[in-house]
């Protein structure tokens, strides 16, 4: 006998959290029916898109078998009598009217966060077999937030001239292109021959270089080792127009990441680093130079790769001073190969964790994206928390303009053919933060950040972004 699952909601926008819930519903049932609240449904003004457009958005999903309009939820459930009613995990500790109805006929109310291991957005794009332009992909996002191509171009131009102070871990990225030779006859080892080596400034250094490339006056504060990689990085930063206040730490080498690549694929990455905390004396030097320069900047960016630059006391002193000067402050704490913690940066204006980093921060691998966003917000007291989802784009959950409700939305990934995904988060962080510092609302800022990420992943290695590059991607 066919098992029916029912999911209901507003669905002003179908984001990654919904897609994962739909997929889970199909895994536990034979048929998925989605109920969309009618325009007349009393939701205190939270319905922002006409029911016809919302139906079209949900119906196009590959996991949805049927869509119904809900004028009265209780009547709809009594008429349909679904075997399972599925809701997001964030509803599990709330009062749910469905519980009173479903017991009447013996159904089940279940909660799920959706599995983040698979890229549902990428899967949908593959099913559709099409590749939309950037403008085609963001048309709905533009409409929902009253944006336009001209307004986004205006934001991109307005970030020029900002004064940006970046603090964080300096990294040198090496790319060694190799020619595959074959498999060793002695053991199952891939044998390659090096052909060409390229070196780029990475880590927080490229965040500062991106800021300079986008037209800002960029200052970078960090540490490096007393070695050739450190000297090469400092010289590169100077050539890229970054004012570098980088202190020598004789207790560590300059952090270096070497990627061995063949035929456009990375075979192996070797990290050379020390991640112990820098000593108190050096930490005080960094803190003091930042505090001395705060008043002459518009934006502070904390770029934490967990290699020892930041102490909790340093973060507290700088953020407290930033608030006194009414500065925009943004932070990212990466957990790709290291173990970062974005909750180390409370009370800033913007944080940009990946989904993995957000889940690690609140120790929750089960809740949906809305639930995770709420938990991170409560842990950090930060309102603007775009969560980056890789090939699924960016998800943002924040208070609406009246502060009475919440708005969820998603910008899809804007580059389907990435060359090198490393550095995408850095590009997103700096472009989003600079947009906010220029006065843009968070929706415009996240769109600009997404365009910047699309530009970055389209090339190998870290090269600074430019405003012309962002505008060209927006037109593509």
Where are these regions (language model features)?
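Nucleotidyltransferase catalytic core that binds NTPs
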Residues: 1-144
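Conserved N-terminal subdomain of the carbohydrate kinase-like
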Residues: 172-301, 463-476
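Histidine-anchored nucleotide/phosphate-binding helix
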Residues: 15-31, 200-214, 319
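Short internal beta-strands
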Residues: 31-38, 88-89, 219-224, 329-333, ...
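Active-site metal-binding loops of divalent metal-dependent hydrolases
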Residues: 10-11, 90, 169-170, 305, ...
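Conserved phosphate-binding/catalytic region of the ribokinase-like
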Residues: 277, 296, 313-328, 335-347, ...
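Short, glycine-rich nucleotide/cofactor-binding loops
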Residues: 6-18, 167, 192-201, 308-309
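Positively charged, low-complexity intrinsically disordered leader regions
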Residues: 1, 138-181, 474
């Amino acid at each position: 006998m066919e098992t029916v699952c029912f999911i209901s909601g507003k669905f002003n926008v179908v984001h990654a959290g919904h897609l994962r819930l739909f997929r889970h519903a199909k895994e536990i049932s034979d048929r998925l029916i989605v109920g969309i609240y009618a325009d007349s449904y009393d939701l205190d003004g939270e319905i922002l898109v006409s029911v016809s457009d919302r139906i079209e958005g949900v119906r196009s999903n590959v996991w949805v078998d049927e869509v119904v309009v809900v004028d009265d939820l209780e009547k709809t459930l009594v008429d349909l009598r679904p075997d399972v009613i599925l809701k997001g995990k964030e509803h599990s500790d709330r009062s749910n009217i469905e519980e009173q109805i479903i017991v009447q006929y013996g159904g089940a109310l279940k909660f799920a966060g959706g599995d983040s291991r698979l890229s549902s957005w990428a899967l949908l794009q593959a099913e559709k077999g099409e590749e939309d332009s950037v403008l085609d992909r963001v048309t709905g996002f533009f409409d929902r937030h009253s944006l336009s191509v001209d307004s986004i171009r205006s934001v991109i131009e307005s970030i020029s001239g900002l004064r940006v102070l970046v603090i964080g871990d300096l990294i040198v990225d090496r790319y060694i292109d190799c020619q595959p030779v074959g498999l060793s006859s002695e053991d199952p080892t891939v044998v390659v021959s090096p052909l060409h080596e390229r070196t780029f400034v990475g880590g927080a250094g490229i965040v500062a270089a991106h800021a300079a490339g986008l037209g800002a006056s960029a200052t970078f504060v960090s540490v490096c080792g007393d070695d050739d990689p450190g000297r090469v990085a400092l010289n590169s930063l100077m050539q890229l127009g970054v004012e570098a206040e980088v202190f020598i730490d004789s207790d560590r080498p300059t952090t270096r990441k070497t990627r061995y690549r063949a035929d456009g694929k990375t075979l192996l990455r070797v990290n050379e680093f020390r991640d112990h905390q820098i000593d108190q004396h050096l930490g005080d030097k960094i803190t003091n130079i930042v505090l001395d320069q705060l008043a002459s900047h518009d934006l502070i960016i904390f770029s934490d790769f967990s290699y020892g630059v930041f102490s909790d006391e340093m973060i507290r002193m700088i953020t407290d001073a930033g608030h006194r000067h009414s500065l925009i402050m943004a932070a990212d704490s990466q957990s790709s190969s290291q173990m970062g913690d974005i909750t180390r940066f409370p009370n800033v204006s913007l944080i940009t964790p990946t989904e993995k980093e957000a889940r690690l921060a609140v120790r929750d691998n089960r809740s949906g994206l809305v639930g995770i966003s709420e938990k991170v917000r409560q842990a950090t007291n930060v309102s603007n928390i775009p969560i980056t989802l890789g090939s699924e784009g960016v998800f943002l959950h924040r208070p609406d303009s009246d502060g009475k409700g919440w708005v969820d939305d998603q910008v899809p990934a804007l580059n389907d053919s990435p060359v090198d995904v490393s550095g995408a988060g850095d590009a997103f962080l700096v472009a989003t933060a600079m947009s906010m510092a220029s006065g843009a609302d968070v929706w415009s800022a996240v769109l600009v950040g997404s365009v910047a990420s699309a530009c970055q992943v389209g090339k190998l290695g870290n090269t600074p972004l430019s405003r012309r590059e962002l505008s060209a991607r927006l037109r593509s």
